[in-house]
Amino acid sequence: MFHGTITKELTSHEEWSHYNENIIEDQKDFVFVKYSGLHLKSMENLQTCISLRVCIFSNNFLTDIQPLQSCKKLIKLDLHGNQIKTLPDKNFWSGLKNLKLLYLHDNGFSKLKNICVLSGCVSLIGLTMFDCPVSLKKGYRHVLVNSIWPLKALDHHVISDEEIIQNWRLPERFKTFSPSLFFNLYPALIKGTTYEDEIKNIKHIISRINEILAHNSPVLIIQRWIRGFIVRKHLSPYFKHKKHYHGKMIRVLETKLICIGRSDEDKYLEDFFFIKPECNIKGKVAHWKQMRYSPADFKYSTEYGKHISCLSYELKTKYIDGKSKQPRHHIHKGQKAMKAESEDEEVDTEFRISAMKIPLYSSRSLKYGAMLKEMKWDYFPQYLQPFPATRQKPPVKRETLWKLKKRREFLATQRAGMKLHMFDDVDKYYSEQKQHEEEARKFAAMVTAQVTQERASVNIREKLNKKIYMTRKLMEKDNETIQKGLQQIWRERLAYLEKVRERKFMFLAEKKLNAADQSLVISLNNERSILLKGITQVERLKKHMSEKKAKHLDVIEKWEEQKYKQDLLMEMKKLRVEEIQKRHCEEKFVIDTLILQKGYERLEEAKAKVEYIKTFYTSKSHKRRNEAMPDHI
């Protein structure tokens, strides 16, 4: 394994060229790199890792991090425990737009001016610079916090509002370096972590920082309160209006609803009309379905036409591809239950629109309808279908074969001797008379249609007036019930307050009794404790005296034993001295005897030698023999 940078000879070798190309292609897809404690000196090989998101180069010998400029997608960068002394310029850090966590602790940074380039990181949340020389300088934290705006946590503490807002004194909980703001921004590295684990760890750290700020930042707490107030204020009309829409039901014809509103109230009505799609119906009137309505919507009869410009009901008479058309609005789930409730109402709020074929109208009727539209009558219903633009031809009556045969025979026999002018005049007269009768009949039909139309409009108006009257009546009843309910609520609340007061009075009385009992118990406990203290002191004194007596007796016994031992030692010494003297005398006697014996032996030897010299050394022969004398002489 190669430590540090790979040499140029190895990378530029011909046999390694294809291998290097493959490595470069693979490095483009790297998202996670971890080289911790490998004694690396450079990171030039990371220039091609354009997809890198998590980079861990801790505990190495790096001095330059410029090769990371191409890694634009970095989220976490761990460079702690290296030998970095200077950081790249602001352009380098502005390119890392996704960088959220940066670990630079335990490096050689010494100048605050060099660290201020980190202000180019637009999304940096966590930064560590402890155990660096620059962290010992005065104002180090103030400079970093106010130069890197998105920063939320520095070293071991989350940034407080007191560090950002000048001259703002906060309670102990929100102060700088308070225990509530402490957070371990750099957890210990775990061996064998994957990219997913690192991403989870990053998310956990960021969420934990945000949670600490949300609970310990006065600015964020006030902002949360204001946002909640604004949202509640914005939604309060909806919740207030929603309370009145409870239970009154009417039946309407199951058709498509077309509502063109001119104000916000029209949108509100559209939201509260629920229509259920009907099954396949061809040429028949659809079933009746239920629908919620509010009495407030029919409050004013004159303004009803202004709020809703068009409520047209189109019967479903076409069946396309065997499927019915779906309405825009969703189905209300409780419609069947509402139908059963609406049938039991005291007031009948139903009305029906009869389905009939459209009669034939002349051009006069069309003009009359146009005139009515120009006059803009209030009772002219907009949901009726318009008159047909073209006049339909009357049906032609065909003669039978027998009549045609008779006519041909008559013309063949009587044509030559008979003139037909009179018959032509008669036929013309009858045809004109028939035409006049047809026109009169059509005019009568048109008049009857107009009369029925007016009657229908009058009936509709009466129905609407009845509905408005009934809705007003229902509103009055609802108001009465609401007032009664409010009065009942106030009564219950007053009764509840009285009960609470009684409970409070009872509680205070019990509290006083408990306080008296507690004071009595405390006094008894104090007296008992004093008595116990006296008893314990007396017992302690007795015990102390008994211990003293026992110690005195022990001392006397030990002194007597020691004296007895000393006497024994003296006697033993005397006996030993006597024995030693006896032994010494015996030894002296033995030594003297031995010395005397040896002296005697020496004397005997000397005498023998003298005698020998006298006897043998007188003559010369003896002198010659003296040379061969034994050694023991």
Curated annotation (Swiss-Prot):
What range(s) does the IQ domain occupy?
215-244
**Which ranges are annotated Basic residues under compositional bias?**
325-336
Q: Which Gene3D superfamilies match?
A: Ribonuclease Inhibitor
Identify the InterPro entries for this entry.
Answer: Leu-rich_rpt (IPR001611), Leu-rich_rpt_4 (IPR025875), LRR-IQ_domain_protein (IPR052859), LRR_dom_sf (IPR032675)
Alphabetic keyword roster: Coiled coil, Leucine-rich repeat, Repeat
UniProt LRR repeat ranges: 51-72, 73-94, 98-119
Give the LRRCT domain ranges.
132-179
Region annotated Disordered sits at: 324-343
UniProt KW Iron-sulfur keyword: no
Kindly list any coiled-coil regions of this protein.
556-617
Q: Which PANTHER family match?
A: LEUCINE-RICH REPEAT AND IQ DOMAIN-CONTAINING PROTEIN 3
Q: What is this protein called?
A: Leucine-rich repeat and IQ domain-containing protein 3
Q: Which organism is it from?
A: Mus musculus
